[in-house]
Regions:
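Structured catalytic-domain cores with a bias toward divalent-metal coordination
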Residues: 1-182
Length: 182
């Protein structure tokens, strides 16, 4: 697959158990991300950096998106519009309401977050999450629990892919908000 995609701009659509709205996932902020991401109907862009090993996203010119909650009709609808937006942003089709393929719109108000570390999930029977993805958690604030035992933030952070049941061995990721798309 990697050989077949060499030199291509690649778009991968997934769904998640952590967040209902679409967001983009990239390896690093490159020219493809800067050109395409502002045209996608996403809430945020996640820069994964060191957390890409073995994933398609570690290859150049690859954008991934999470379309919404797994199995939801909204995620399926979002996937359709994400695919259309990607095709319009890359000049393959006209954007809805645009006169030609060059008029794909765009915005700069999309927040960019960089993953810093994993949030491990201790062995437990029941997990809870109290924080919301992409919303700042303050130092000392309870953000999750394992068998009723609270997990408190050591320092401020933004949770990303935070879910009680998304990953077997981790709640999600600690991230920093590093700015907006430029």
């Amino acid at each position: 697959l990697v050989d077949a995609l060499e030199g291509c701009t690649t778009f991968a659509i997934h769904s998640t158990q952590s967040y209902a709205e679409p967001f983009a996932v990239i390896d690093s902020m490159d020219e493809v991300t800067r050109a395409v991401a502002p045209h996608l109907p996403v809430d945020a862009v996640i820069q994964t950096d060191a957390f890409t090993e073995g994933r398609l996203i570690e290859h150049p010119h690859t954008l991934e998106v999470e379309a919404g909650l797994q199995g939801s009709e909204a995620a399926a609808d979002n996937a359709y519009w994400l695919a259309r937006a990607f095709l319009a942003a890359t000049g393959a089709i006209s954007a809805p309401g645009a006169d030609d393929v060059l008029d794909a719109g765009g915005r700069e108000d999309v927040s960019v977050f960089r993953l810093r570390e994993r949030i491990p999930k201790p062995d437990a029977e029941a997990y809870e999450v109290f924080a919301r993805n992409f919303e700042r958690v303050e130092a000392g604030e309870r953000f999750a629990a394992a068998d009723g035992e609270p997990l408190l933030a050591d320092e401020p952070f933004y949770p990303v892919l935070l879910s009680s049941n998304g990953y077997r061995d981790q709640f999600g990721y600690v991230a920093d908000r590093v700015g907006t798309l430029e």
